[in-house]
Amino acid sequence: MAKILIVDDEDNIRLFYSEELRDEGYEVVTAEDGYELIDKIRSDSPDLIILDIKMTGYNGLDLLQEIRREFYDLPVILCSAYSSYKDEGKSISANAYVVKSSDLTDLKKKVKRSLEENIPAPE
């Protein structure tokens, strides 16, 4: 099954997303900040990343640009509590964007679609 890397500075979000995605049959690894992110990509070889935009000390949009420099084809889904980042995420090559919610239906659909189609990053 596909491996998903969840990057979020909130423990409860990482735990909630991890449990829900494991229930869907995915293998899940987590990172709590940008320091861990690139190391986790190299060590765990995820098939997809779910990346929080607003983390303490980090901007997920900047991290996405860093990911794209080295791992251009790795699907990345941005997530935020704010819908205002959607257009900005698309403009810097996110594969999808979701607003954080206790209902993960949208996230699960976008994870499945991104993995099945291996959607390349927009140019």
Describe the function of each predicted region:
Residues 30-48:
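Acidic, metal-coordinating helix/loop segments flanking the phosphotransfer/catalytic sites
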